Amino acid sequence: MIEPHRGFETSEFANRCSKAQQAMTKSDIGALLLTSEADVRYFTGFMTQFWQSPTRPWFVLLPASGKPIAVIPSIGEQLMKSCYIGDLRSWASPAESDDGVTLLTTVIREQIGHSGKLGMMMGRETSIRMPLVDLQTLQNLLENVEFLDMTADVQKIRMIKSPAEQKKLMHVCKIVSDVFTSLPEWTFAGMPLNELFRRFKIKALESGIDDVSYLVGGAGPNGYQDIIAPPNNHPLLNGDVFMLDTGCLWDGYFSDFNRNFAIHHAHDTAKDAHQKLFDATEAALEILKPGITAADLFFVMDRELRPNQSSQNTGDSVGRYGHGMGIQLTEPPSHTDWDQTIIETGMAITLEPSINYGDGLTMVTEENLLIVDDGFVLMSTRASRNLPIIGNL
């Protein structure tokens, strides 16, 4: 397998910034303030695990034209200098008071004046990564500035993956698919669930993954009840059904899919649930092409799984049947009955139907796909219709 080029050409970041600036111009927005890890990385290439420390705020200001301006703690200067920026301002952080707020205010005023328009990410699936009290101080210092939401514009730009992004996504999904394919070779009855998780991470790293930053799942007789839990030391027993759902990273891009298995044998209800989920995914694949909506995907899967219900959005549901993916584990859109986002060429999405069965059991399957002009390309190796059974020789 040929490994894609790490990082991006300068033109990639220039194109991303240009698209955002075109959207800013339409709303007469003088600058866009970015504070989250994903948005800062998307527009500058600033990639570091140092974001796991909540101590320091990091700011990037995208002006109406030109390269982004970084306003960051001095500890990040050297790395940020290697990124796609036109200017860098820094301060010693953490500060006893005024942790970058006055400096940020100055830079914003340089770009939009005292009464311009400042774009921010305010909508669904966003957050402002700075103390609320500092945000309030910033708003008070910029009392004549109009704060406007640019969530829809930025998310639309990020939804469409460039050819370089697509190669990274295809690569990470191929590696993880191969690890899942090998899983029955090193999994056995009696293995504690936490040891299985640990072994999976080791196999993924040995196969070329940069990090296994997300790995959840469950196991139990005939099935599992929880799909987001960390592992326990429960040994896998004959008749257990288990699931691993993983988000693995390669050069900052995620895979996000799961696989189900049974040990030695499985009850017919578990086998039936797995087949229904496969059929629901197949129904979605049959209509998947540019021009449909995320809601269309929801409804076609829901009709397969719950033919007698008008909507999946009940108290015992997970709320959606898949989502976008990329530099974050999950990204817009959401395959729900209300999301009218148009599926477009270049999107990377998951299909993730789920079903309840038996006595409080649940099962979920997930595939990763890339949307192309005439339909889709599977990035994950398609799960089988029949529930894989380990040790039934």
Specify the residue positions occupied by each region the protein language model found.
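Active-site neighborhoods and metal-handling regions in enzymes and metal-associated proteins
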Residues: 1-393
